[in-house]
Swiss-Prot record:
The keyword Cell membrane does not apply. Keywords: Ribonucleoprotein, Ribosomal protein. This is Large ribosomal subunit protein eL14. Coiled coil: none annotated. It comes from Thermococcus kodakarensis (strain ATCC BAA-918 / JCM 12380 / KOD1). The keyword Ribonucleoprotein applies. Part of the 50S ribosomal subunit. SUPFAM superfamilies: Translation proteins SH3-like domain. Belongs to the eukaryotic ribosomal protein eL14 family. NCBIfam families: PRK04333.1. GO terms for biological process: ribosomal large subunit biogenesis; translation. GO terms for cellular component: cytosolic large ribosomal subunit.
């Protein structure tokens, strides 16, 4: 299992959003990823350091750079909650 990949569910472990679950929407470079809460929690789409994320075994099938609506539909289809 790659640590960080597109579609991977992760928990934020540092900063104001610590404890929140997010979905990796895109990989920017080796240190940063684009994450989102897809409107299901208070985490907005933003760049985040990979050192501040703890990946979970859950994953949804999405394309790189998918919109929040597409990610939300994939999460609901897979029965995964970000709460």
């Amino acid at each position: 299992m790659p640590a960080i990949e597109v579609g991977r569910i992760a928990v934020v472990i540092a900063g104001r959003r610590a404890g929140q679950k997010v979905v990796v929407a895109d990989i920017i470079d080796k240190n940063f990823v684009l994450v989102t809460g897809a409107g299901l929690n208070k985490v907005k789409r933003r760049r985040m350091n990979v050192k501040h994320l703890e990946p979970l075994p859950e994953r949804v099938n999405i394309q790189r750079g998918a919109s929040d609506e597409e990610i939300k539909a994939a999460l609901e289809g897979a029965g995964i909650s970000l709460e």
